[in-house]
Amino acid sequence: MFGMGSKTIVGLDVGSSSIKAVELKKKGGQIEVAHLGLEALASDIVVDSMIVDSGTVSSAISKLFTDCLIKTKAVATAVSGHSVIVKKISLPSMSDQELAETIEKEAAQHIPFDLADVSLDYQILSEEAGSANMDVLLVAVKKDKILNYTNVLSMAGRTPSIVDIDALALQNCYEYNYQPAPGQVVALLNLGASVMNINIVKGTTPLFPRDVSVGGHQYTDSLQKELDLSFDDAESLKLGNKVGTVSEDAKAPILQQVTEIIVLEIQKTFDFFRASAAGEHIEKIYLAGGSAKVPGLMEALRQEFSMPVELLNPFQRVVPPTDGPGAELVEQNPGQLAVAVGLALRSFESL
């Protein structure tokens, strides 16, 4: 959204529990992974989508690039959370130049921040010939939020070329890998550690991007407290691994309680969407993110919403690495790399 592209861009997803880096290359008629890696972060380094400890994150980025042998300087990253506002607005049809001249005035009516404090971007969603109106997606991000991320990238010796938002990077990943039919409406869910990005998409048009302040850390916190576990053991248990003598009967109800909270937030979002998009029907849910594979979550979504639910695979068309740590990451949980892949695909915008 914000910034200028360059030839090759590394997709860098700075999350609450880890940093993911993906660099892609074009080979023949395909796009394949050149470099890919993940660096874990302690839970107090990135809090509520803000980088609290810049030095630690900067060092982690440098280490990740060194370990992955990434020499490219240009980086695309993404932000989410309370400092990000995304609104679909309807305006009288006008030329691109007229829109550029009036967008700030229109934004002032829809953005709950002082416009001096935000960076604005917009995208025309639909403009039918002869129609009196046009739909525009308005994106506003607080400048201090952008600086919070770009300063850390600069500290790590990288060039912040693009700052996107997570929900749109997720969509970019989906579009390239799944090549959706123009009328197909799906819900993309990215369940990170502290934030869930939701983007309801029709074909290649974002209809309803939204961030919700629930995430995988709630599973981990509940398991820690209820079963008196360390953070690492709770995290492992959350992802379906066996830990000590903890039984399935002890774990399942704790996971289910958090799943119910997450499902409720998704239900609210779907209700908001249906109220604002008359006649549109969500056909399928794609689930991504580090906590997408929590036991019971996919089944709960299928039961609650009575529609197909599947894990979003960022390597449906993007060719993954075949060996090394990158291949292991893809095998373990490809969905946690969806935002980073979507960002890295910005290198090939014309495809």
Residue ranges and their predicted role:
Residues 1-40, 59, 74-78, 132, ...:
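Gly/Thr-rich phosphate-binding beta-strand-loop-beta motif of the actin/hexokinase/Hsp70
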Residues 1-106, 147-149, 157-159:
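Non-catalytic, solvent-exposed interaction/assembly segments
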Residues 43-46, 143-172, 178-180, 205-246:
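Glycine-rich phosphate-binding loop plus the immediately following alpha-helix
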Residues 61-74, 156, 229, 267-284:
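Phosphate/pyrophosphate-binding loops at sites that engage ATP/ADP/AMP, CoA/4′-phosphopantetheine
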Residues 78-178, 284, 314-321, 336-339:
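Active-site neighborhood for divalent-cation/phosphate handling
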Residues 225, 236-284, 291:
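Adenine-nucleotide phosphate-binding core of ATP-dependent small-molecule kinases
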Residues 258, 280-316:
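Glycine-rich phosphate-binding loops at beta-strand->alpha-helix junctions
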Residues 292, 310-351:
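Glycine-rich phosphate-binding/hydrolytic loop that grips phosphoryl groups
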